[in-house]
Regions:
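Generic protein-terminus/edge-of-domain signal
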Residues: 1-57, 64, 96
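A hydrophobic/aromatic-rich effector-binding and dimerization subdomain
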Residues: 2-10, 70-137, 157-164
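Helix N-cap / beta->alpha transition motif
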Residues: 18, 62, 84-86
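ATP/adenylate-binding site constellation spanning eukaryotic-like Ser/Thr protein kinases
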Residues: 39, 74, 175
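Histidine-centered metal-chelating micro-motifs
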Residues: 59, 63-69, 88-89
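Short, Lys/Arg-enriched, Trp-marked, Pro/Gly-tolerant hinge/linker segments that flank
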Residues: 110-119, 136-149, 156-185
Length: 185
C-alpha cells in the first residue's frame, strides 16, 4: 500500500494509502488534499499544528500545505483525494467565504456516534467511492468537466455539513464550560 504522493497533481487523484511516503520528511503540497481515515491511528503535522487521526476522521487542506506523518499504527489507512489548484479555484467560485474560513480554521473533524454524524460519514465514503470510480484509470473525453463537476459538488456538500460540525464544536465548548463552572475551577 506504499503509494508515492507527488507534491502537486494536474488531475484529480484518488488513492488508498498508509501515507508511508510522508513519514521520513514533510512534503509541501501545492494541490489540495482531502483524506478520511478508515483504519488505524496517526499523528499528522503541518509544521505548525498536529492532528490526531483515528477511524472516521477527516482532514482537508484546500491548497498549499506542508504535511508529515509523525507516527502511525501499522494498520493506518486513509482514502485520499488530491485536486489541482486550478480546478479548485474554478470550482470554489460560487462558494461563500465562510466555508473557506471554516476549513482553514478547522481542517480536522472526527465523526461521533450520533445518527447525523454517522450518516455524514457514510456520505463522505460515497464521495470517495465516486472519486475512485471516476478518476482511477478512467480515461474519458469529459475528464476535465467531470473533475470540475465532482469537486464543486463535493465542496458544496461539505459546505452543507458545516452547520453540523459547528453544532458539535459548540456542544464541546459548552460541555467544557459547564465542567469548569461546576467543578469550581
Amino acid at each position: 500500500m506504499a503509494v508515492f504522493l507527488p507534491s502537486d497533481t494536474s488531475t484529480i487523484r484518488y488513492e488508498e494509502t498508509d501515507l508511508a511516503s510522508l513519514h521520513s520528511r514533510p512534503s509541501h503540497f501545492v494541490c489540495g488534499v482531502y483524506l478520511i481515515c478508515v483504519r488505524g491511528t496517526a499523528v499528522v503535522s503541518t509544521g505548525v499544528q498536529q492532528y490526531a487521526l483515528g477511524e472516521q476522521t477527516e482532514l482537508i487542506f484546500l491548497t498549499g500545505s506542508l504535511i508529515q506523518v509523525l507516527c502511525a499504527s501499522d494498520d493506518f489507512t486513509v482514502r485520499l483525494l488530491m485536486f489541482p489548484k486550478e480546478v479548485f479555484l474554478k470550482a470554489v467560485l460560487p462558494i461563500d467565504t465562510p466555508y473557506l474560513n471554516y476549513t482553514h480554521e478547522h481542517p480536522c473533524y472526527r465523526h461521533t456516534e450520533d445518527e447525523r454524524s454517522q450518516a455524514t460519514w457514510l456520505q463522505i465514503n460515497l464521495w470517495m467511492d465516486m472519486a475512485q470510480m471516476l478518476f482511477c484509470g478512467n480515461v474519458s473525453p469529459f475528464r476535465q468537466q467531470q473533475e470540475y463537476n465532482f469537486l464543486q459538488g463535493l465542496l458544496m456538500w461539505l459546505f452543507n455539513t458545516i452547520q453540523e460540525k459547528l453544532e458539535r464544536i459548540l456542544q464541546e465548548i459548552s460541555g467544557v464550560e459547564t465542567e469548569v463552572f461546576c467543578s469550581g475551577r
